From Swiss-Prot:
Name of the protein in question: Flagellar P-ring protein
Keyword field: Bacterial flagellum, Periplasm, Signal
Pfam family, one: FlgI
Gene that encodes the chain: flgI
Organism: Sodalis glossinidius (strain morsitans)
InterPro entries for the chain: Flag_FlgI
Gene Ontology terms: biological process: bacterial-type flagellum-dependent cell motility
Top-level taxonomic group: Bacteria
Assigned GO CC terms: bacterial-type flagellum basal body, distal rod, P ring; outer membrane-bounded periplasmic space
Keyword Signal annotated: yes
Disulphide bond pairs: none
């Protein structure tokens, strides 16, 4: 059986050297998004909202909202509503976002609602980790999933308990940033690499002058910049477009134990080894037969007798030779030749690494 491997570089041969821009390899320290979260209500659902008996917080939230709008609900009223759902609203506040800017929000059901399709999110304050309100969200929810049910049968495509509102929140407060102050910025590499940190630092020094950049460790580079704000923006825009010629990177194999997917980059190399792969299958089948007496007046009685059959089957197990692979195509061909499933391949790759046949970093998620 052929094994389909997801490869970052594809199955085609790729050159070992490539050019990238500094902006694709680094980020500027302090220039980042900030997470926002809020609790709100979605109304206008077509009978697919929360069951109020199971989610009392939905009823409580609705009472509080109506009270703020001047609508008094008599104490002890049992509100059986099916078109309201309690939700959590999340968003990301971009760096340098200003008041009045719109951002996207994600709405997720918190209770027992079956679907948020067709619902409208009521005004929801979005707070940061400092408990300050930075945005207000409201609008119609777009749900990508769909579903139908009838006669006890149900068909559903994708999730119905979550959706998005494009531009559904308006920024009310910006996050303070000290980007314009000071004459130093920090570049952070996306991945730890001493060689790449030194390479980027050398490229910046060649472009702007000696000692403009200094690598502090495998991830951080200190860069001297003009003190004024506009000059710093122009400097950083020019810096981020400096090309960097990348050499060989670390060989990495990433295994997702939940989905069974295996991802490897083009630098993975296999050493020569022999692999024996097989499965022990035990099948237990139980059948029932009716036993009745031969003579109708012999005094016997009809009984049901269970019969159990056990079959033990050992499949595979042949020793297979794997030649050393110098590129991704050779590695994929060798692993496909084993005929293992993705789940079996996880154990095989771990064993290969233990014996020194897999010259790569193995990451299991």
């Amino acid at each position: 059986m052929m094994l389909s491997l997801c490869a970052i570089a594809g199955l085609l041969l790729a050159p070992s050297i490539q050019a990238e821009r500094i902006r694709d390899l680094t980020t500027v320290l302090g220039v980042r998004e900030n997470a926002l979260i809020g609790y709100g209500l979605v109304v206008g659902l077509d009978g697919t909202g929360d069951q109020t008996t199971q989610t009392p917080f939905t009823t409580q939230s609705l009472r509080n909202m109506l009270s703020q709008l001047g609508v008094a609900v008599p104490t002890g009223t049992n509100m059986q509503l099916k078109n309201v759902a309690a939700v959590m609203v999340t968003a990301k506040l971009p760096a340098f976002a200003r008041a009045g800017q719109k951002i996207d929000v994600v709405v997720s059901s918190l209770g027992s609602a079956k679907s948020l399709r067709g619902g409208t999110l009521l005004m929801t304050p979005l707070k940061g980790v400092d408990n300050q309100v930075y945005a207000l969200a409201q609008g119609n929810i777009l749900v990508s999933g769909s579903g139908a049910q009838a006669g006890g049968n149900r068909v559903q495509v994708n999730q119905l308990n979550g959706g998005r509102i494009s531009g559904g929140a308006i920024v009310e407060r910006s996050v303070p940033a000290d980007f314009a102050g000071g004459n130093v910025i920090m570049l952070q590499l996306n991945n730890d690499d001493f060689s790449l940190a030194q390479q980027i630092s050398d490229a910046i020094n060649r472009h702007f002058g000696h000692r403009s950049a200094l690598p502090l460790d495998s991830r951080t580079i200190n860069v001297a910049v003009p003190p004024d704000g506009p000059g710093k923006v122009r400097f950083l825009a020019s810096l981020q477009n400096i090309p960097i010629t990348l050499g060989p990177t670390d060989a990495v194999v990433v295994i997702n134990s939940r989905t069974g997917s295996v991802v490897m980059n083009r630098d993975v190399v296999l050493g020569s080894c022999a692999v024996a792969h097989g499965e022990l299958t035990v099948e237990v089948n139980r059948t029932y037969k009716v036993s009745q007496p031969d003579t109708p007046f012999g005094g016997g009685r009809t009984v049901v007798v269970p019969e159990t059959a056990i079959n033990v089957r050992n499949e595979g197990g042949a020793l297979q030779q794997i030649d050393a692979g110098a590129n991704l195509n050779d590695v994929v061909s060798a692993l496909n030749g084993i005929g293992a499933t993705p789940n079996d391949l996880m154990a095989i790759l771990q064993s290969m690494q233990s014996t020194g046949c897999l010259n790569a970093k193995l990451e299991i998620n």
